[in-house]
Design a protein with these regions (language model features):
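Substrate/ligand-engaging "lid" and interaction regions
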Residues: 2-5, 11-156
């Protein structure tokens, strides 16, 4: 199975990006700074996403997820080297530092970096100011405009 590392285990990451990644056969590994959330994700390994549409509410179960603390450098770097897709939903001001971390790894395999942020060309903006050693890192721009209301704490 392909591996995706997603920075940001908040509402957009868990409620929007992870379901799309899993629907496309990616194993999802979240990276976050919230140690309680990281612990909960790693203990439960699953959560539910409730979506509302014109026909009412639908519930989707997201399975087999993991999380890594941003400060756990050794495990994070090893995980990043194995990932084929690296994504973010952390807020535009943090994308450049994440891109720099990925771009300075000496990776020999093809990887894709997508910043799913509420900012035009967030991926390109981050990559334009960083000299990448990773020549196999491809940049894709995306803009996210989806409202994910706060989820109850019991739903992870």
């Amino acid at each position: 199975m392909k591996q995706a590392v997603h920075f940001g285990a908040g509402n957009i990451g868990r409620g929007f990006i992870a379901p799309i990644l899993q629907a496309n056969d990616y194993e999802v590994i979240f990276v976050d700074v919230n140690t309680d959330l990281i612990k909960q994700i790693n203990e439960e390994r699953q959560y539910k996403v409730t979506s509302l549409n014109i026909d009412g509410a639908t519930e989707e179960k997201i399975n087999d997820v993991k999380a890594i603390d941003l400060g756990d450098t050794e495990i994070l770097n090893e995980t990043l080297l194995n990932a084929s897709l690296i994504t973010t939903s952390v807020g535009p001001k943090f994308v450049e530092s994440i891109y720099e971390r990925v771009a300075t790894l000496d990776n020999q395999k093809d990887q894709i970096f997508i910043a799913f942020e509420n900012m035009y060309k967030a991926s390109s903006s981050a990559s334009s100011s960083i000299n990448s050693r990773n020549k196999n890192l491809k940049i894709i721009d995306a803009v996210v405009d989806k409202i994910v209301p706060p989820q109850p704490p019991t739903s992870l």
